[in-house]
Amino acid sequence: MSKTDFSHDLLRFSDEVKEALHSGKPVVALESTVIAHGLPYPENVATARKIEAAVRAEGAIPATIGIENGRFLIGMSDADLERFGSTRGIPKASSRDIPVILAQGGMGATTVASSLVAADLAGIPFFASAGIGGVHRGAERSMDISADLIQFTRSRVAVVCAGAKSILDLGLTLEYLETQCVPIISYQSDDFPAFYCRSSGFHSPHRLDDATVIARSIDMHWKLGNQSSVLITHPIHEEDAIGTDEVESIIREAAVQAEHEGIRGPGATPYLMRAVAKATEGKTVKANMSVLISTAALAGKLACAHIDYLRQQNQA
């Protein structure tokens, strides 16, 4: 039985997700920024359905999260997906934006950080995202650090992703996570991946090849009293990956140009991502779809392994 508070006044559960949590089925939370900001309509809705299908194929239930009418949507119906995909101007909601958007009663597309807030409130221990935010290059001057990293220290949710984007300072990102005692586990890989690239050039703190051992590690982390996330990474499929050196060269050149044009803060990330997409002649589109699907599938697999592990523990 779930410990979820289904009467929480800030949560609106879909019937499917409510039943799954109530009966102890594995559930995977998903963000809605990819729907409202990632792709044009109707491609965005079709992509969201593919991501949900990848979770279902592994035996888990997807719970796409959004904000509407003063509550978090925990799981979206087809009508919800269509509305979020076709409505223009939905603001991107990170952790700091949640109270204002909830109070105004408007719509909000959840990021990694805000999705973790909702997943934790809803009692969903797994979340999938293609890639996380991190410490930006030049953060020693700008102090530009993604809210994702801060939220990892506050939410008891296992985050499955393909690492962080190469446009970030991945060395400092890993240092920050180490300082905050956030475990990093790379599934069937020795390296910390970098979204489009199979390796960031940095060795992962832990490699685990067994889903049950990962499930046990997550359980141990929370049994120790930690209130933070566990980060589980898995690299993009080799056939869809873009070379690390190629991407790094593009980013360095684009970063210089961005600085010259005075592009900083929130505008820097989309600027650099567009530069990579243009220079690789659209290879990033295929790569992005690949990591969206593969991380969702792995999250579904690990959520099932976690449920099985907990059931075995309860029977012991």
From Swiss-Prot:
Membrane-traversing stretches: none
The keyword Manganese is annotated on this UniProt entry: yes
An example molecular function term from Gene Ontology annotations: metal ion binding
Enzyme Commission code(s) on record: 4.2.1.70
Class in the EC hierarchy, top level: lyase
Binding site for substrate: K92, V112, S146, A147, D148
Knockout-associated phenotype: The mutant shows lower tolerance to oxidative stress. It exhibits a decreased ability to cause systemic disease on potted S.ionantha.
Cofactor binding note: Binds 1 Mn(2+) ion per subunit.
GO cellular component: cytoplasm
Induction profile: Moderately expressed in the wild-type strain. Expression is repressed by the HTH-type transcriptional regulator PecS. Weakly induced under oxidative stress. Expression is 10-fold induced during infection of Saintpaulia plants.
Entries under InterPro entries matching the protein: Indigdn_synthA-like, PsuG
Residues annotated as binding Mn(2+): D144
Protein family according to the UniProt entry: Belongs to the pseudouridine-5'-phosphate glycosidase family.
Listed PANTHER family: CARBOHYDRATE KINASE PFKB DOMAIN-CONTAINING PROTEIN, ZGC:136858
Function recorded in the entry: Catalyzes the reversible cleavage of pseudouridine 5'-phosphate (PsiMP) to ribose 5-phosphate and uracil. Functions biologically in the cleavage direction, as part of a pseudouridine degradation pathway. Part of an operon that could be involved in the biosynthesis of the blue pigment indigoidine, which is implicated in pathogenicity and protection from oxidative stress.
Protein name, as recorded: Pseudouridine-5'-phosphate glycosidase
Species in which this protein is naturally found: Dickeya dadantii (strain 3937) (Erwinia chrysanthemi (strain 3937))
